[in-house]
A protein has these predicted regions:
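N-terminal non-catalytic accessory region
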Residues: 1-262, 268-287
Length: 287
């Protein structure tokens, strides 16, 4: 039997999902298949290490420095990074002032948003639609990745991790059974002792256990933070972003109550502060 046409499933603002099919030549007798996302969404939130979040200047500080742009810290912007070498100590202090900087988020309302956030380019997989193989259009993959915060972190360092999480977590099972590399090859995870990866103990993941978590969508988000400030302050900002992410999926009619947090380096300290009642106070929304 011929493989069916897999249609891209679109999620609308009211939460409904739809797909559009086109007419084909009469010789093409393949059917069309629309894959609907699960009703449950469990966002995966990545928090980077120190200096791993891109920062921008406030309008006032940009004016004081007479800069042509508002970049404070963006290592992947090579010319701006090189220019920092030739700044005086006083200028560098003004550029990296915790009170005059904030996370450089992707804003669709900015006319040059895509150009500014071009550090995220050539994303190989993103599961924002219901297609078995992810979003087909390259530009749409990049745009959706930026909307998920991938461009507010150092993508050259974290891009592989974000794409691996997005791909692996959203391609775990098909027809209730482990898919592809979950079940075979160098990256096999099912029936592999965790000691193979350096764990002290623990039992191997079974196909049955994997099947119990396949009925969810795992959209991967990155949340940058102002690493010039205290981790306690950063945790409060990250907590607010997490609640916004949960609200976003709830508005799309998904069952979404908590997120999974993945951290790197100092992001782990932010993560600890995130669930501390005196700082992020987000223990109720972190799995």
């Amino acid at each position: 039997m011929s493989e069916p046409h897999i249609l891209e499933t679109r999620i609308h603002a009211n939460g409904t999902q739809s797909a559009q099919a086109s007419s084909t030549p009469t010789a093409d007798q393949r059917g069309c298949e629309m894959r609907v996302l699960p009703n449950r969404a469990i966002p995966v939130v990545f928090i980077p290490g120190i200096m791993g979040s891109n920062l921008k200047l406030t309008a006032k500080r940009r004016s004081e420095l007479d800069k042509s742009n508002n970049i404070s810290w963006r290592p992947e912007a090579a010319m701006d990074s090189l220019a920092m070498v030739f700044k005086s100590p006083a200028q560098r202090q003004m550029m990296l002032d915790p009170e005059a900087t904030e996370v450089d988020r992707y804003d669709l309302n900015e006319s040059e948003a895509n150009k500014r956030h071009k550090n995220v380019s050539g994303v190989s997989y993103i599961h924002v639609h219901g297609s078995k193989n992810g979003v087909v259009n390259k530009d749409e993959r990049d745009r959706q990745a930026r909307l998920k915060g991938w461009s507010e972190v150092m993508f050259s360092s974290y891009g592989d991790l974000l794409q691996t999480l997005e791909s692996r977590l959203n391609q775990m099972c098909e027809d209730g059974k482990p898919r592809g590399s979950w079940n075979s090859g160098k990256r096999q995870a099912v029936d592999v002792p965790p000691q193979n990866w350096g764990a002290a103990d623990g039992e191997a993941l079974s196909a049955e256990e994997l099947g119990t978590v396949c009925d969810a969508w795992y959209p991967v988000h990155a949340i940058g933070y102002n690493w010039l400030r205290s981790n306690g302050e950063a945790a409060k900002d990250v907590a607010q972003r997490i609640r916004e992410i949960i609200a976003f999926y709830k508005n799309l009619k998904f069952d979404c109550g908590k997120v999974i947090v993945v951290t790197h380096s100092m992001g782990g300290l932010v993560g600890r502060a995130l669930i501390h009642p005196d700082y992020g106070n987000a223990q109720d929304v972190v799995a």
